A protein has these predicted regions:
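Alpha-helical solenoid repeat scaffolds used for protein-protein interaction
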Residues: 294, 300, 311-565
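Residue register of alpha-helical TPR repeats
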Residues: 28, 66-70, 129-133, 172, ...
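Short coil/turn linker motifs that delimit alpha-helical repeat modules in TPR/alpha-solenoid proteins
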Residues: 22-23, 41-42, 61-62, 120, ...
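Amphipathic alpha-helical segments of tetratricopeptide repeats
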Residues: 51-58, 91-104, 156-168, 202-214, ...
């Protein structure tokens, strides 16, 4: 007797023809086939198969099988970003479980009279599908709403369910916990919250390495984890660590013939090649991957492909082609409402405007990007500093294009670039670990500091140039930075987010200096620097702006250092 019998059309799915059989064994076999189709990312075929079982399951009077249909459909809608469908499936699972829980509590005698399941079977079903519902609830909070706190709470409920009453559900529970962690970690990375994802990735990798690895479920998790963690490594500047995971995930996906999963690993490898400066290999990989990604209806990944297509066009100065490709990326990100990514692609598209000499259009895009960033509740000071530095680059380009009226533009550019440079550099020198300092220099501070020097030099402001040199000399670190820097436009939308970051280090930067023995680099903020006994400390206004805008106190509360002979 079905206790839930609503049709699935409300979830946005068309009715499907019913199968001509209703054997529970055959239905269970079809559910397993649907699961394999989901693993292969053939969601349309899986959905049609699942929908075709609805009437037959109703005739078989098996609510447990119907719950499995809802659970699998919910997963399909989740990965396809059809979040209304996820909510519909989640609601149906919850409604059904509520009825059976009331039966077991003895508070619903009418429903109890209709139920044909034993108490043990009811308890088994409640345990199994409460977990599956919690998985959908957690994934929905992370992926659809970016509500990482709710996702974390949901994950705690899922991991805290340590019941051993049904040993046959233990493997499935491990699967949904690990899969939920992958989804939550990936969602954090989408929002530039890579630091918060680290504990999740640690749990995921441990689960992968300790699994038996002898089932399709294990292989699916390995592919999802390897792809997600590989992307995490690329985005945090750990390219050497990314490649083995992406290769391993790609090989396992290829073994099963999972075309979309294979393509996604290829695409992540292409992003690593771009970061390493290997444009030819990046182009080969992204073009090979795009077809399967587009056919898989992954709007976010499609947008990322178009971003790299645009970057490749921009690298050979095909401005119209680059702008068109960036436009495709922006359109797809707007469709899935990704404000942080829309802000990035607007900044990237503004480089096309800069190269065309259309500085008004570049500023307009940048101002729209700022509005999106300001409305983003999880924005970081580093994102704001990078945006200010970018606007300074527009003003610098405008000044270079109009030498007769350049002074005012250079001054405005310096007002943006120098405080941003001081802020990110102060964070670099708050790090006691030398490798962390070098990663921060490679991916954040070196380029921004170089831009500040360039503006001061091109402005002809010898006083500011001297002060920047004095500041850098006081750090004792002229020889510790990489020699070559990529052009500004190459990293606007793809800049790495080092784990040695963000708000925590803004606070550390304001702390006391760290003694490092005989080291040439002073850790922590510098005290005020005075180059001339008749004048005040250098760059005082720029340091004040750095604190006002980003919360980075770049000056230690100590007596001033005198740098004259």
């Amino acid at each position: 007797m079905q206790l839930i019998c609503r049709t699935l059309e409300a979830a946005g799915a068309p009715p499907a023809p019913a199968a001509s059989y209703n054997s529970p064994v055959t239905i269970a076999s079809d559910l397993e086939r649907a699961r394999r189709l989901i693993f292969a990312a053939d969601e349309e075929a899986a959905k049609q198969l699942l929908l075709s079982l609805d009437e037959q399951i109703e005739k078989a009077d098996r609510d447990d099988l119907l719950l499995e249909v809802y659970a699998q459909l919910g997963e399909i809608y989740l990965v396809r970003t059809a979040y209304n469908g996820v909510e519909e499936c989640l609601g149906r699972i919850t409604d059904c479980l509520t009825i059976y829980q009331s039966i077991r509590a003895g508070t619903n005698p009418e429903a109890a009279a209709k139920s044909t399941m034993s108490d043990a079977d009811v308890d088994h079903m409640i345990c199994r599908y409460s977990r599956r519902a919690q998985f959908l609830r957690t994934g929905l909070a992370a992926a659809a709403h970016g509500d990482h706190e709710a996702a974390e709470a949901g994950l705690l409920v899922l991991t805290g369910d340590t019941s051993t009453a049904f040993p046959d559900l233990a493997a499935e529970h491990r699967f949904v916990v690990t899969y939920a962690r992958i989804l939550c970690a990936s969602a954090l990375c989408d929002d530039d919250l890579h630091v918060r994802s680290v504990p999740l990735w640690r749990h995921v990798l441990k689960a992968i390495e300790t699994s038996c690895g002898d089932s399709e479920f294990d292989d699916f998790l390995l592919v999802q984890a390897g792809t997600g963690y590989g992307r995490f490594c690329v985005e945090t500047g750990r390219l050497s660590e990314a490649e083995p995971w992406l290769q391993r995930a790609g090989a396992r996906a290829m073994k099963h013939g999972w075309k979309l999963a294979t393509a996604r690993t290829q695409f992540e490898r292409s992003t690593a090649r771009w970061s390493a400066g290997d444009r030819a290999e990046c182009q080969r990989l992204v073009h090979e991957a795009y077809s399967a990604i587009a056919e898989g209806y992954r709007a976010h990944d499609v947008s990322r492909c178009w971003l790299y297509f645009g970057l490749l066009s921009l690298s050979i100065e095909m401005l119209d082609d680059a702008d068109e490709r960036f436009g495709h990326a922006e359109r797809h990100w707007r469709e899935v409402e990704k404000p942080l990514h829309i802000h990035r692609i607007l900044l990237q598209r503004s480089w096309v405007d800069i190269f065309r000499g259309d500085f008004a259009a570049a500023k307009e895009r940048t101002n729209e990007a700022r509005m999106l960033l300001d409305s983003w509740p999880r924005r970081s000071w580093l994102q704001s500093a990078r945006l200010d530095d970018h606007l300074g680059s527009i003003l610098r380009a405008e000044a270079l294009a109009d030498p007769d009226n350049a002074a005012a533009k250079f001054e405005q550019a310096a007002e943006l670039k120098v405080p941003a440079a001081l802020a990110v550099d102060s964070v670099r020198h708050s790090m006691t670990d030398a490798d962390a300092r070098m990663r921060w220099a490679n991916h954040v501070s070196a380029r921004i500091l170089a831009g500040a020097f360039a503006v001061a030099w091109e402005w002809g402001n010898t006083e500011l140039v001297s002060e920047l040199i004095e500041y850098h000399s006081a750090r004792g670190s002229f020889s510790t930075e990489p020699d070559a820097q990529a052009a500004d436009w190459t990293e606007t939308a793809t800049a790495a987010v080092p784990l040695d970051t963000v708000d925590e280090y803004a606070l550390v930067a304001a702390g006391s200096a760290v003694s490092t023995g005989a080291a040439l680099t002073r850790l922590g903020p510098l005290p005020p620097l005075r180059m001339d006994p008749t004048k005040g400390p250098i760059m005082s206004r720029y340091r004040a702006l750095a604190f006002e805008r980003y919360g980075c106190a770049v000056t230690a509360d100590e007596p001033a250092w005198s740098t004259w002979p």
